[in-house]
Amino acid sequence: MRFLLANPQVVLRLLLEHIGLTGFSLLLAILIALPLGWLLHNHRRLAGPVLSVLGIIYTIPSIALIIFFIPVFGLNARSVLVALVLYCQIILVRNVLAGLDGIDPAILEAARGMGMGTW
């Protein structure tokens, strides 16, 4: 507690760095997960293998995954960013897929009747 009170500038800088890294990794993860979930929804054969690989990645301890990326990206925020994006994928892709699968077919039919296209 003494360190926090004695160094508020350092704590604030590190807090903002942490929030920025987390927010940026979540943004990247969403940009990857939405099209991937849509692809898996349209190509059901791929859903099982892709979700299995993402599940296996999710079981790797976080520190081990970050250490695995250090030789590839170096000892910097990029290693952490890649690990965070990979960890988010199983959660996001599975939920995007569940959301798309949960759309009532009657709603899709009504939307097509009103002119909805593929996108």
Residues of each region from the PLM?
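Periplasmic/extracellular loop-to-transmembrane helix junction in inner-membrane transport proteins
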Residues: M1-S25
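Residue-level signal for discrete positions within transmembrane alpha-helices
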Residues: L14, H18, G55-T59, C88, ...
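Helix-loop interface residues and adjacent transmembrane-helix termini in multi-pass membrane transporters
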Residues: L16, N42, V72-G74
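Hydrophobic positions within alpha-helical transmembrane segments of bacterial inner-membrane proteins
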Residues: T22, L26-W38, N42, Q89
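Hydrophobic residues within alpha-helical transmembrane segments
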Residues: L27, L31, V53, V82-L86
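Cytoplasmic-entry segments and transmembrane alpha-helices of multi-pass inner-membrane transporters
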Residues: L36-F69, L84, R94-A98, G102, ...
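Membrane-water interface of transmembrane alpha-helices in multipass transporters/channels
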Residues: P49, G74-V82
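Amphipathic cytosolic juxtamembrane alpha-helices at the membrane-cytosol interface
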Residues: R112-W119
